[in-house]
Amino acid sequence: MLQTEMKVIQQTEIADKVYELILTGECVADMSPGQFLMLKPSRSDLLMRRPISICSYDKTAKTCILLYRVEGDGTRDFSKLSEGDTIDVLGPLGKGFDIDQTPAPKTALLIGGGIGVPPMYQLGKELAGKGVQVTFVNGFQSAKDSFYEKEMTAYGTVHIATVDGSLGTQGFVTDVTKNFPEEPDVIYSCGPKAMLQAVKASFPETKTYLSLEERMACGIGACYACVCPKADDTKKQFKVCEDGPVFRADEVSL
């Protein structure tokens, strides 16, 4: 973990209220798929950092890409960043996805919902680099909310589900996966809790990893704001920011 400043290379709105923020800094060297950064807004009245998932990184170039949706004052503040600006960053944080499994999987299904789609990109890139056959399933409310379909096709097959049917399959991600003829060797998923519950229920026998989206305050496990009950004893809890955000599906009670 490192508190540092990163410099803005570029920022672009790539979907409705969804921004692609490209940063450069030394902390990129320590990043792994599924981790996140805690960004500090520039406004003095916004005291809490905001957690943003790492979409991708290039350790040679020392750059990373964050995708986020403007939902409040903090992310609205980030959306005003431009080339050359600096931002106070804490990270990379959390335990990411396990991609070095034994035996190595031959097929992987990566399921993302909304702003849970970004961490699937780097994960898919690294799995594909290991020779794994990758399938992405991305869920959005509408076509105007969708992003990174073209980028993901470089590493696997991409399926889209939209609630209003304006792009891809009408419905939810599970309306896509229920038609797949075979189950994958491993599943990775990130998105809203209801989606993760549906994914977990749909593939009870498949090794599944879930990246949980919880509101965070500190990002380092000190404040207990982002807890999740353990599956084997719901009176005990994981700290999502420190113990996760990625967990085996059988570890957590959603």
UniProtKB/Swiss-Prot annotation:
GO terms for biological process: 'de novo' UMP biosynthetic process. It holds the Pfam family DHODB_Fe-S_bind. Pathway: Pyrimidine metabolism; UMP biosynthesis via de novo pathway; orotate from (S)-dihydroorotate (NAD(+) route): step 1/1. It comes from the Bacteria. Gene3D superfamilies: Dihydroorotate dehydrogenase, electron transfer subunit (2.10.240.10), Nucleotide-binding domain of ferredoxin-NADP reductase (FNR) module (3.40.50.80), Translation factors (2.40.30.10). It comes from Listeria monocytogenes serotype 4a (strain HCC23). Responsible for channeling the electrons from the oxidation of dihydroorotate from the FMN redox center in the PyrD type B subunit to the ultimate electron acceptor NAD(+). The gene is pyrK. Heterotetramer of 2 PyrK and 2 PyrD type B subunits. The keyword DNA-binding does not apply. FAD binds at residues 50-53, 67-69, 74-75. Residues 1-99 form the FAD-binding FR-type domain. This is Dihydroorotate dehydrogenase B (NAD(+)), electron transfer subunit.
